[in-house]
Structures are given as C-alpha cells and as structure tokens.
Amino acid sequence: MKTVKVSIDSIEKVKEFVTIVNEYPYDFDLVTGRYVINAKSIMGVFSLDISKPLDLNIRDAGAQINEILESLK
C-alpha cells in the first residue's frame, strides 16, 4: 500500500480526481481523521472536508504506482 497526500479543494478537482482513479482497477481510499471512504465514489469524496489535504491510500498498484501518481499531479 502506498499513501500520499492529495489536495482536492474544489468541485472541478474532485470531478477530475474521481475520473482518474476510476480508470484503474485498484482500491483507492481517502482518509481523514477516523473516516475512510472509497475514493472512487464522488458522493463519498464530497462527504469529506475537502478544504484540507487528505491521505490517499492506493492498494496493490504494483508497477503502475508511478503512472497513477503522475496522473494525479
């Protein structure tokens, strides 16, 4: 599992983020405090406080991890 900080502090950034993570077959979770939500769920992402950076957990991405991180920049 790889964990990175992401900042998705606007509606457009949330839409773009969810579109990108849905292109991959891996599990993506957003974590803030005690809440963990599926990062592929736009409703789930909007339920979080997106004004602050969030932790993104990427599970089992293997060799594609660098490609994923590059696409999220």
Annotated model-derived regions:
Residues 1, 31, 48-52:
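Short glycine-enriched loop/turn motifs at secondary-structure junctions
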Residues 1-7:
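Short glycine-/aliphatic-rich beta-strand segments at the starts of folded cytosolic domains
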Residues 4, 26-28, 54:
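Conserved beta-strand core positions
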Residues 11-27, 35-50, 67:
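Amphipathic alpha-helical interaction surfaces in cytosolic regulatory modules
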Residues 47-73:
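C-terminal structural segments of small proteins and small subunits
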